[in-house]
Structures are given as C-alpha cells and as structure tokens.
C-alpha cells in the first residue's frame, strides 16, 4: 500500500509539473528552455518509473541496476530514503536488501539499522556463521486446489526462493528459530488448505443439492406445460390435415370426372372425323380414276414433252460448263501473263513484289472449274467432278502440283526484280573484295586485314572467259544479271565455296525464289493453254 501510494503521488507530481511547465512554455515560446525542460521531465519520469517498477519486479530491478546509467545509485538511495533510520527494523524490508541488512545487523554494525538511532550496547564478540540457511518449498498435494490459494502458495514459494538465493549464513540458534517459524507456516498453510477444501466440498454439496431440486421442479413444470402444448398442437394439426385431405380428394374426384368427360367428347369427335376422312378418301379415289382416264386420252404426249425438256436442260448445263471453263481459262491466262509482266518489270519499291493476291485469284479460279484435280482412281472412271466416297483416291495433275508449289514458294514472301537483284549484287562488291584477300583459314585479324586492304582494290568489269578468281566471277555474275541471264548468274554464285558463298547466301535465296516462281508460272501457263 505504501509503495502504491508513493508511486501515485510521484506520478501526480510529475504530471502536474509537466502540465504547468508546458502551459508556461507555450505562452512564453522559448524553444531551448522548452526542450531542456521536456528532456529533464522525460528523464525524471523514466528514472522514477524504473525505480518504482524495480520495487515490484526483481528481474526488472536487476536489469535496471545493471544496464541503466545511475540506476543502481537511484535504487539504493531510494531504499535508504524509504527504509532508513525513520523506519522500524524489519518492517517493509525489500528482498533486494534483505541479505545486506541481515549481515549488517548480525555480524558487522548493529547500530546501522537501529530504529531510534540511540545508544545501544555493542557486542564485542561476533558469533561467526556456522552453516547456510536452507529451506524447502511449500508443497500442497491437492489437484482441486483453489486458484487464489494456489496463487498464495506460489507467492510464498517465490519469497522462500528469494531468501534461499540470498545465500544467508546464520548460527544454529537463528536457523532453528527460522525453521520453527517455517514449520508453523507450513502447518498453517496445510491446515488452511484442508479447511478450505472441506468448506468448498460442503458448499458444493449444498449448492448441488439445491440446484438438482430446482432443476427437477423446473423440469416437471416444463414437461407438464410441453405435454399440454403438444397435445393441443397435435389435435389442431390432425383436424387441419383431415380437412386438407378431404378437400384434396374432392378436387381429385372432380378433376377425374372432367377428364373422363373430355376423353369421351374427344373420342366421339375423332370417330366423326374418321368417318368424314373415309368418305373424302373414297371421293378422291373416284376423282383420281376419272382424271387418269382423261389424261390417258387427251394428255398422252406429256411424257415425251418432259423427256425433251430434260434433254434440253442437260445440253444447257454442258454449254454453261463449257463457257465457264473457257472464261476461267481466259482469266487464268491473262492473270499469268500479268504476273510474268510484273516479274520482268523494274521493281517500284525497295522491298520487292508480292504475288499473294494473284495466287489467291488462281486458286479461286481453279476451284470454280475442276481444272487442277484429276479424275479419281476408282474402277468406274469417274469424271473430274467425282462424287464418290472419301475412299476414292485422286491422283494429282501437273496443274494442281504447280499451284501448290507456287503457293509455297511465293505466299508470304517478296519477289525481287532483275534490277533489284542487280543492285543487291552490287552491294556485295566490298565483301567480295575482302573475301578475295582472305587466307585459307582466316581469323578475326585476317578478316580485319582483308577488309582494310580491300579498299585499295579496283572493281573488274566485263566478262572474263578464263578467269576463275573471285573478281572475275563477280564481274561475270554482274554482266549476266545485267543481261537478264539470272540462271547463269545463279549457277556461278552457287559454285562458290567458303566465305564468299556465305556472303552471297541471302542473294542466292532471293534469286532461287525468283527463278522458281518464273518456272512455275511458265508451267501453269502451258498447262492452261493446253486445256
């Protein structure tokens, strides 16, 4: 109680001081003084709280004394102030200074903690300690121990452990007195526990009996009320169910009667309708016989007229197919001629020529009239518009193969003109000069040296019949491209080996693509003209 009141008063003083100083500082607006006062106030609150908490928690007191600057001195001064000459010896002694006070009183300075500070007789002869004070913890064997009593036993054991940890050395008489007091305390605790358990058992028994009686009375009352309620509810539900069942059966009976009535009426109507239909059929049969006789007599030439119309329709279909085939062939010849003209003309763009639209047009025309597919292989030797099963195989003709290969070669790709191929070949002039100066197995240094010295070479022009060096080959290819002899130029370039062939690989692909497209267009043009 004294510690708690002291801490409360100290906290109130600190808070009141902080509030007063804060109001004054805000009014005067002195930032330096305000900072100093706040720092001092914070340090005061910190140390005051640490000292106050050290009185209640031994672990925190040890940490505060060891690691906080001036913590040990403040705690010591507080204990001297609180437990000094003005207090009675033995009252309110903290566990922290218990060992020191016992040693001072018994062995060293008996006047240091004297309550009155008066003169006392000093014992000249000090009895040396004979053995260490040892105590056992209080043990109460009861599983149903009250929580509050268990907390009390734990607090007593904690105090005993603290006294044991002080390692106090006393005489036999002092130890005997302490052990006697300890035995009395243990007996009192055991007796209190026994009385507490007996009282608790008695109270539990009385309350249990009272609760059981109350529950029995309440159960009987609830059972009677519930029985009456369920009986009334059952009678009411039974009456409601009986009324609903009677109403349901009455409705079902009325529904069945109406259904039977409708069935009989429908059956009667069906019989009347059947009789009418039979009469109509007989009348129709008579009329048909009359019409057949009249047609055989007056319309005998109708079948011959129908056969003539059918023959005329077949002739018209054949003529239509022939005209459509002729138109498709004409458009395909015109389209292939325009493709040839585009390939021979100079390119209008640097990227090349795209033939996707023309190829799609050729595929569409070939699908209108079956020109590109052959007749089937079946034994019946069907025509080109075979309608046999899927198992009927078809052998591809040159027309179908040509269209497919043209689609693969030119679809999604650009075709270069002769002028564009010639310009791209001229762009390889520097690489050819460097390649002509390369050794057998050139490295990075060899390529660099050849590139530097190639700037000093002159470009050879014209055709050299016997020339086999790279400059002669370059000049021959240039001349063939200029004269539109792309096949010979491509053959000379393909015959190159090593690094020159690698340099010309892109040009070779473009030239091959152009020659393939031209050859396929020529093949398709020949096939279309032969139809």
From Swiss-Prot:
Which keywords fit this entry according to its UniProt record? Coiled coil, Membrane, Mitochondrion, Mitochondrion inner membrane, Transit peptide, Transmembrane, Transmembrane helix
**Chain ranges on the Mitochondrial matrix side, renumbered to this chain:** 16-34
- Transit peptide range? 1-15
UniProt GO BP: cristae formation; protein import into mitochondrial intermembrane space
The compartments listed are: Mitochondrion inner membrane
Q: Which residues form a coiled coil?
A: 210-267
Q: Out of the domains of life, which is the source?
A: Eukaryota
Q: What is its main location?
A: mitochondrion
Q: Where are the transmembrane segments?
A: 35-53
Tell me which GO cellular component terms the UniProt record holds: MICOS complex; mitochondrial crista; mitochondrial crista junction
Known InterPro entries for this protein?
Answer: MIC60
| Residue spans, topological domain Mitochondrial intermembrane | 54-531
UniProt keyword Membrane present: yes
Q: How does it sit in the membrane?
A: Single-pass membrane protein
Q: What does the UniProt function comment say about this protein?
A: Component of the MICOS complex, a large protein complex of the mitochondrial inner membrane that plays crucial roles in the maintenance of crista junctions, inner membrane architecture, and formation of contact sites to the outer membrane. Plays a role in keeping cristae membranes connected to the inner boundary membrane. Also promotes protein import via the mitochondrial intermembrane space assembly (MIA) pathway.
PANTHER family noted in UniProt: MICOS COMPLEX SUBUNIT MIC60 (PTHR15415:SF7), MITOFILIN (PTHR15415)
- Oligomeric state and partners? Component of the mitochondrial contact site and cristae organizing system (MICOS) complex.
Q: What does the sequence similarity comment in the record state about its family?
A: Belongs to the MICOS complex subunit Mic60 family.
Q: What is this protein called?
A: MICOS complex subunit MIC60
Q: Which organism is it from?
A: Vanderwaltozyma polyspora (strain ATCC 22028 / DSM 70294 / BCRC 21397 / CBS 2163 / NBRC 10782 / NRRL Y-8283 / UCD 57-17) (Kluyveromyces polysporus)
Q: What is the lineage of its organism?
A: Eukaryota, Fungi, Dikarya, Ascomycota, Saccharomycotina
């Amino acid at each position: 109680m004294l510690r708690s009141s002291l801490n409360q008063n100290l906290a109130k003083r600190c808070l009141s001081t902080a509030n007063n100083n804060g109001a004054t500082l805000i009014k005067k607006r002195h930032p330096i003084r305000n900072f100093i006062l706040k720092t001092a106030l914070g340090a005061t609150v910190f140390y005051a709280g640490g000292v106050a908490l050290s009185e209640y928690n031994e672990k925190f007191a040890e940490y505060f004394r060891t690691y906080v600057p001036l913590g040990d001195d403040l705690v010591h001064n507080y204990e001297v102030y609180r437990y000094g000459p003005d207090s009675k010896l033995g009252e309110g002694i903290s566990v922290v200074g218990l060992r020191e006070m016992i040693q001072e009183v018994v062995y060293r300075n008996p006047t240091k903690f004297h309550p009155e500070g008066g003169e006392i007789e000093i014992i000249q002869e000090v009895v040396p300690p004979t053995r260490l004070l040892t105590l056992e913890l209080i043990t109460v064997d009861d599983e149903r121990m009250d929580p509050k009593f268990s907390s009390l036993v734990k607090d007593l054991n904690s105090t005993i452990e603290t006294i044991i940890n002080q390692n106090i050395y006393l005489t036999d008489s002092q130890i005997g007195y302490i052990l006697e007091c300890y035995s009395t305390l243990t007996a009192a605790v055991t007796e209190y526990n026994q009385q507490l358990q007996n009282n608790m058992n008695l109270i539990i028994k009385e309350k249990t009996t009272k609760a059981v009686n109350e529950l029995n009375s309440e159960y009987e009352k609830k059972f009677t009320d519930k029985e009456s309620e369920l009986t009334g509810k059952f009678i009411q539900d039974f009456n409601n169910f009986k009324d609903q069942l009677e109403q349901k059966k009455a409705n079902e009976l009325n529904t069945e009667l109406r259904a039977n009535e409708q069935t009989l009426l429908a059956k009667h109507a069906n019989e009347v309708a059947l009789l009418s239909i039979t009469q109509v059929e007989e009348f129709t049969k008579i009329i048909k016989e009359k019409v057949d006789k009249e047609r055989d007599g007056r319309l005998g030439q109708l079948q011959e007229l129908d056969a003539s119309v059918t023959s005329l329709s077949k002739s018209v279909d054949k003529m239509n197919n022939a005209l459509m085939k002729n138109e498709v062939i004409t458009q395909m010849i015109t389209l292939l001629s325009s493709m040839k003209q585009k390939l021979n003309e100079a390119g209008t763009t640097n990227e090349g020529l795209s033939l996707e639209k023309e190829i799609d047009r050729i595929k569409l025309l070939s699908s209108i009239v079956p020109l590109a597919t052959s007749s089937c292989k079946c034994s019946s030797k069907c025509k080109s518009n075979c309608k046999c099963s899927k198992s009927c195989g078809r052998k591809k003709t040159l027309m179908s193969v040509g269209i497919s290969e043209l689609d693969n070669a030119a679809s999604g790709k650009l075709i270069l003109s002769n002028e564009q191929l010639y310009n791209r070949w001229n762009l390889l002039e520097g690489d050819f000069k460097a390649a002509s100066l390369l050794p057998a197995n050139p490295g990075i240094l060899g390529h660099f040296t050849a590139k530097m010295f190639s700037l000093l070479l002159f470009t050879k022009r014209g055709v050299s019949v016997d020339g086999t060096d790279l400059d002669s080959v370059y000049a021959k290819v240039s001349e063939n491209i200029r004269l539109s002899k792309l096949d010979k130029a491509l053959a000379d370039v393909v015959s190159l080996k090593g690094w020159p062939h690698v340099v010309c690989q892109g040009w070779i692909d473009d030239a091959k693509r152009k020659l393939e497209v031209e050859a396929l267009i020529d093949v398709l043009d020949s096939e279309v003209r032969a139809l």
